[in-house]
Amino acid sequence: MEIILLTPANTTDAIFAQIVAIEENCGLFTYPPEVLWECIAIGDTYALMDDATVADFITIDPDATDYFDRSLHIVNINVAAAYRRQGLASMMLRTCCGYYAQSHANLMVTLDVESTNTSARRLYEKLGFTVSDMPSENGEDDLVMTIPLEQLIS
């Protein structure tokens, strides 16, 4: 498997259709296709490719100001159903956030998670994320979780 940075130039219709399908099949809050495309156009969406199949994708905002003066914010991460429970989400979080280690030293990594999404919360807690008392900008039922970048990638 290989991680690639998605751009409008290298994101084929087939790859984008897979990303939309993964997003639609996650069963929780989903971003519409135009928002997913905007994330790719901005330049911080990574896909884990298993040959021509998207196994996992993650979108990172490297200059988020939602909760701190500046943080790495995980906008979205989704694993295709056939690839779940294989540690791919953990690997993608650590690896892709690690790409920013030099330029974003001493920053926090933040994410919003639905309070009812217990499997995601368990994953994030296992990685060392903690629930913050900051209110989520995504909705009343979402929790903000944080971890120092250095701790996540070590």
Residues of each region from the PLM?
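Conserved hydrophobic beta-strand within the GNAT/NAT acetyltransferase core sheet
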Residues: I74-I77, V109-V113
